[in-house]
Structure formats: structure tokens, C-alpha cells
């Protein structure tokens, strides 16, 4: 009932963070935190999938397993070196059953992108750099100025989130360079990612205090990120652990449509699975602002146009599933409702604010989220509905992502605006 038609999800078991996103030898590889045994967190492995186009995904065998029942292969990244694929990841040992450091950084290698061999010299980073560090995980590695650069999520004394920087010439021997960023609003930072877009260094990171993905944009200079602007990478409730692809000529990011906040309410567990990835998005900088938009490849999902109108009103859609895209262009203000007789999601745009209300979206409930927006002569909202999620993009600039669980088809669409053009496209089921 709730299995997505065009989002990536595990056929069975639990999935969380995307890991090791890489474009390698003409294909997009996505690894992810995975428990193949049951739809709950635990026994964490690295699941693996591959795509030719970022849209149609194929499941592959598990890439990395833990060595012991009390261990886990936690989040990390992938890079290419000498034609081979290298995975850099956090290895976890449950401290209640194991001695020594609970989180260390390790490496695995593959020549074919399918079979991975763990490095005999693991761990390549055996302990945190200083006392008081209570989190030490999620290495994201990129190439910069002729060397490998790793950022790690961390925390200090259960009070402040930190991002640590390491450098290496060979992926096996790492030098600690220091703390490049701190966030006092959270006790730890997870899944950091440092990318450069144009002339800007952009740190993307997740914080446990609000289960959100944030960005800080500025310049990395003399071992510190000098922040010029910061904000949310996504303004919804359910976007987390975002990571960018290695090896692409643009910055493409995927996040986990997270299940932490309302895990017990999610009915997908009854279907034997839990976890959905976001649609792939492109990040870019325009007018000194970090912006986000759906990747162009998603246009290939459109099967047929099921509805269009150039006026306000309430309309019945010819759809059999919650699997469609709405494209709405308008001037000024708008109220857009998508739902059925008992469930709905409401998007409201006033002069300078966009509000999304998912409180009546389905059995798992929801929240109201809002963001300040810049009004344009013609505004555009793209909404992607897919069984158990909805993602909104406004003016190819900001995004809102939510997990929802409607019990019936959203076949009623209501729009109120002075000037509007609205189209609805049925989208392909990539799993058939």
C-alpha cells in the first residue's frame, strides 16, 4: 500500500543514511545504511544499488557486513583512486560488549564495484583526536588541491557539535588538521559534507537536536570555515543525512526521508520495510544564495498528463495511485490543496512566506512548516507525491520534504489564485 513507485527504498528491512554516493565508470552507485533482517535499526550493513540515470535503480548484493553481531558498518563515502572504488566508513563496536574505541575509520576497496575487500591495516584512524569527543563518525572524503580531504562529524563534551578535518596522500595515512566548524545548537554533528560550488565552500551537515540538514556557506581558510550564510537545506520535517555524489560535474545530493521522529507510527513496518531516499537534487549558487532543484533526469518519469487548468477551482483527478507530479505556475498568492475527502496536504504562498501543512496528510500525522521566500513575477511549485512521501520545490530554490501515509488516493485538487497554470503528470513505476 505504501511502497513507493519512483523513490528508492529497500524491498525488505530497514534503511537510513545514503552512503558512498559516487559516479563511477559510467554508473551512479548508492550505498546506504541497511538492516536486511527486519524493518528496525540494528545489524547495520552497507546496502548497494546502481543506476544509469539517477532515476531507475537496481538493487545489488550487500557491499559491507560487520564482523560481529555487536558491530556495525556505519556511514561513510566513496571515491575513485587508480581506477578502483574505495569506501571510507565508520566501523562501530558496541561498548557494552567490546573493549577499545567504539567508532573508528576504515577503508575497503573494489576493482569491479561489486565485491569489496576490507583493508588489512584497518582502522586507518583509530581514535578521536582529543579527550571529550563523544561522537566520531561519518567520514566524507573528497579530492582537493592534490590531496584527499576528509570531514568527520563529532561532538565535544555532550555540549557542542563539531566538524573535524583530516588530510591524506593515499587514503590510508591520515593527518588531523583540526576543528573547522562548530555548532552550539546541537551536541553533535552527523554526516558532514564539504563541497565547493563556484567560489564558495559549502558545509552540509545534519544535527540531532532538530533532525535537520543545515548548510554553512563561506570560505575555508587557515583551517576554519569562515561562514557568510547559513540555513536549512530542506524546510520539511523528514530530510536527513544528505550526501553529495563524488565524480560528477555538478553537485547532486540525496537525503534520507528519515524515520526517526515517528518511527512507531509508520505503517510501512507492517509491510516488512522501512526507509525511503529523497529524489536526487542539484545544488547551485545564484546571486550568492545556495539553491536546490530537482535533477533534470526526473522529467523522464512523466508517463502522461492527466490534468491541466488555467483557473481556480476544485477538480477530480483521473489517478489510481498516489504517484504523480504537480507543476503549478502562478503570480502573487496561492492556496493549493491535494488530498481526498478526509486527508490532505495544503500549500499556501503569501507575499513572502511559503507554508506547508501535513497535519491531516494520513495515518502518521504531520506538522506545519514554513519558510520566507522571494516573490517572482511568475512563481513555480513542483510537488512530487509518491505513496508515502511528498516533496515540494519552490522556484528551483528551496525544498520541503515530508513522509506521509494517506490511506486513500489523493484524487482531489483545489487551487485558489488570481493567475495560475497547473499541470498534473502521472509518473512511472520504476520497480515494474
From Swiss-Prot:
Its EC number is 3.2.1.26. Substrate binds at residues 14-17, 33, 41, 74-75, 92, 137-138, 188-190, 208, 260. One of its GO terms (biological process) is carbohydrate metabolic process. The keyword ATP-binding does not apply. This is Beta-fructosidase. Pfam families: Glyco_hydro_32C, Glyco_hydro_32N. Belongs to the glycosyl hydrolase 32 family. PROSITE patterns: GLYCOSYL_HYDROL_F32 (PS00609). It catalyses: Hydrolysis of terminal non-reducing beta-D-fructofuranoside residues in beta-D-fructofuranosides. The keyword Transport does not apply. It is an enzyme of class 3 (hydrolase). GO terms for molecular function: beta-fructofuranosidase activity. Optimum temperature is 90-95 degrees Celsius. Highly thermostable. Hydrolysis of sucrose, raffinose, inulin and levan. Specific for the fructose moiety and the beta-anomeric configuration of the glycosidic linkages of its substrates. The enzyme released fructose from sucrose and raffinose, and the fructose polymer inulin is hydrolyzed quantitatively in an exo-type fashion. Gene3D superfamilies: Exo-inulinase, domain 1 (2.60.120.560), Glycosyl hydrolase domain, family 43 (2.115.10.20). The active site is at residue 17. Keywords: Glycosidase, Hydrolase.
Amino acid at each position: 500500500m505504501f511502497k513507493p513507485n519512483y523513490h528508492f527504498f529497500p524491498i525488505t528491512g530497514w534503511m537510513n543514511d545514503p552512503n558512498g554516493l559516487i559516479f563511477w565508470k559510467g554508473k551512479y552507485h548508492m550505498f546506504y545504511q541497511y538492516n536486511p533482517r527486519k524493518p528496525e535499526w540494528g545489524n547495520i550493513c552497507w546496502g548497494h544499488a546502481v543506476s544509469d540515470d539517477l532515476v531507475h535503480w537496481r538493487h545489488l548484493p550487500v557491499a559491507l557486513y560487520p564482523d560481529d553481531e555487536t558491530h556495525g558498518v556505519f556511514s561513510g563515502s566513496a571515491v575513485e583512486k587508480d581506477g578502483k572504488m574505495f569506501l571510507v566508513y565508520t566501523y562501530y563496536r558496541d561498548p557494552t560488549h567490546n573493549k577499545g574505541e567504539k567508532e573508528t575509520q576504515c577503508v575497503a576497496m573494489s576493482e569491479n564495484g561489486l565485491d569489496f575487500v576490507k583493508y588489512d591495516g584497518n582502522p586507518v584512524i583509530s581514535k578521536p583526536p582529543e579527550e571529550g569527543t563523544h561522537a566520531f563518525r561519518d567520514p566524507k572524503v573528497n579530492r582537493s588541491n592534490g590531496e584527499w580531504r576528509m570531514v568527520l562529524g563529532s561532538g565535544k563534551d555532550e555540549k557542542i557539535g563539531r566538524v573535524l578535518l583530516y588530510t591524506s596522500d593515499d587514503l590510508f595515512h591520515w593527518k588531523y588538521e583540526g576543528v573547522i566548524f562548530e555548532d552550539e545548537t546541537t551536541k553533535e554533528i552527523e554526516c558532514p559534507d564539504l563541497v565547493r560550488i563556484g567560489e564558495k565552500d559549502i558545509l552540509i551537515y545534519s544535527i540531532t537536536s532538530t533532525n535537520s540538514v543545515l548548510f554553512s556557506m563561506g570560505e575555508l581558510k587557515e583551517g576554519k570555515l569562515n561562514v557568510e550564510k547559513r540555513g536549512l537545506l530542506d524546510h520539511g520535517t523528514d530530510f536527513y543525512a544528505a550526501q553529495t555524489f563524488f565524480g560528477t560535474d555538478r553537485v547532486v545530493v540525496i537525503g534520507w526521508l528519515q524515520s526517526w521522529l515517528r518511527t512507531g507510527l509508520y505503517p510501512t513496518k507492517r509491510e516488512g520495510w522501512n526507509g525511503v531516499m529523497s529524489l536526487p537534487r542539484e545544488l547551485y549558487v545564484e546571486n550568492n544564495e545556495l539553491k536546490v532543484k530537482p535533477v533534470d533526469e526526473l522529467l523522464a518519469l512523466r508517463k502522461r498528463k492527466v490534468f491541466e487548468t488555467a483557473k481556480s477551482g476544485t477538480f477530480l483527478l483521473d489517478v489510481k495511485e498516489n504517484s504523480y507530479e504537480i507543476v503549478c505556475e502562478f503570480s502573487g498568492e496561492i492556496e493549493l490543496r491535494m488530498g481526498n475527502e478526509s486527508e490532505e496536504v495544503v500549500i499556501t504562498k503569501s507575499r513572502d512566506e511559503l507554508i506547508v501543512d501535513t497535519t491531516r496528510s494520513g495515518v502518521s500525522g504531520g506538522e506545519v512548516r514554513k519558510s520566507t521566500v522571494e516573490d517572482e513575477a511568475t512563481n513555480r511549485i513542483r510537488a512530487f507525491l509518491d505513496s508515502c512521501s511528498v516533496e515540494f520545490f519552490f522556484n528551483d530554490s528551496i525544498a520541503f520534504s515530508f513522509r506521509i501515509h494517506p490511506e486513500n488516493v489523493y484524487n482531489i485538487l483545489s487551487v485558489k489564485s488570481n493567475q495560475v497554470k497547473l499541470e498534473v503528470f502521472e509518473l512511472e513505476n520504476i520497480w515494474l
